[in-house]
Amino acid sequence: MSYSAPETPSAQRPERPTARPSERVQIFALPTRTMYGSLRFSWLSYLGLAEQQHAAQLPTSTAAVSYLSTQALMRAMAAARLDVPSSAASEIEVDRSCTLCTSGKKHGKPRIAGVNFNMSQVNPLVVGAFSRNPSAVLGVDVETLDARLFSGFARLALSNEERAFYERVAQERPAPVLHLFSVALWTAKEAVLKATGHGLSVVPSLVRVQLTDDLLDALELAMNEEVPGDLLGSDTPEPTALRVLTQDSLTAQATFSAPRVGNQGGEAAERSFSLQWVPVALPDAENPEHAQKMLI
């Protein structure tokens, strides 16, 4: 999750604990398997006919369910913020126009007037980040711990400083730790680029994450933990509820040298972002002893 304020760089929910109330970031999560259960009709009520028709045209059922889950959670968050009943959530206008090009295509970062949010999804989880601060530049990404990163990740996605750190980790740490480090870096870069709306239209190496051995140690410890509790902080969580693996704050800073848009001249504008990772585990519905770990 990335967050930049002007001054500084059943869905379940954790909160960003150290921020002032006006800058607090909330994370909502919806397992996509919800769409296969009895609650799917409640979630589908948030969606309009156009979204359901679009889902029906997607090539796989997994893609359709992920899309429906993302749109339903997005509209549920917006409805709660705008005090709109769920029966009218499908009428909330979503602006998908791109602010970084003049093509007119609807491939931009989704925006809803009066709601500051960002969405991400990976099978089997959809997450949404929300802030009451309308000026905050907010982005979120989620990846499974076993995610397969693209070939040439270090060469193409990392800055020179990050690559040097990566190569040292590759020499000094076991392969699973190097992979965790790579997933953490990728989620951070994706979150920043989603926050700005650039996405992968720019090279990820323009996002530079400030890395330390302490951060890597904390990430490794968190992903090896099985801490009781779920995102709601319930004393008696359901066996299959999404669980947070640590209450420790996993944070860093990042900078992004944003390319100038259009005919704007001069050097690229540099912006600062605060990063926070939330390690979670989603137990298997049929066998809660086994869980899929993810990094938000």
Where in this protein do the model-derived segments appear?
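Core catalytic alpha/beta fold that binds nucleotide/phospho-ligands
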Residues: 2-296
